[in-house]
Amino acid sequence: MSANKNLRAILVMVTAAALFTLMDAGMKLLSQYYPPMQVTALRSLASLPFVYFYVTWRSSFKAMLQVRWPLHLLRGVIAVVMLVTFVIGLHNLALTETYTIFYVAPLLITALSVPILGEKVGTARWIAIGTGLTGVLIVLRPTGAGVFTLAGLAVIASALCYTFSAIIIRILGRTDSMESLMFWLITMLAAGSTLFALPQWLPIRPQDAWLIAGIGLTGFCGQWGVTYAFRHGEVSAIAPFEYTGMIWSLGLDRLIWRTSPDRYTLIGAAIIIGSGLFLVRRERVHAEAEHP
């Protein structure tokens, strides 16, 4: 695959990670009042208008039915489980801690992209990913007690679901349109989560309307970015840039919840950024070699 395509996909992924961090902060705020399943439903329902507008603008309704239904349905189910378990983690853990545990996903994506997708993962990528994961461990300083709680296990389950979702995107991207990937994911996520949320549904507070709308917008834009990145770039090259969300989570924890990172968190964050910059540099060198 062209290194230029990988570099473009990496830039899109970095932007998507920032948007998703904003969305996750909004969901954490909502989770203090609403049940996890309802937060999941509100996130997907708020994104529906943006998705439908996008599909209409692209005039892609015909492509909506020409899809590989089994994989889309599987991805929809995985998405519901992924978001619900992630919200459970957000409710009980700090945003930065939640992200730290979740960042096992890029390593899982890279590992599974070899046997499932047949991608080649060179030594440099493994080193960069391993280095980034080391930074995550420094931030978390896991002793076992912090990870193996219900909230910690929920985030690990969410990361595993995200891993399979990313791989399914790559498989579907070979035959299905980008619009169909987004349309059916959000539609199935909204339908499934709303159905399960109805028994415990709480009235929407007026003061939460702006927050729900913001979650919908950032969720749509972030989903577009992730779908684009995994569809047009190599999964194993894109996955490490999930780590950049850590930087945004540190800032939002300080801004909203008044929690400051300690020196271990700062050291770990520096390592994570360094591993990402190393891969960006590597992809750029390859791109220049292909197009002198």
Please state what every model-predicted region is.
Residues 33-81, 161-165, 184-199, 274:
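Transmembrane alpha-helices of multi-pass small-molecule transport proteins
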Residues 105-127, 247-266:
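C-terminal transmembrane-helix exit sites in multi-pass transporters
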Residues 25-28, 36-37, 51, 145-204, ...:
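Transmembrane alpha-helical segments that form core, pore/gating elements
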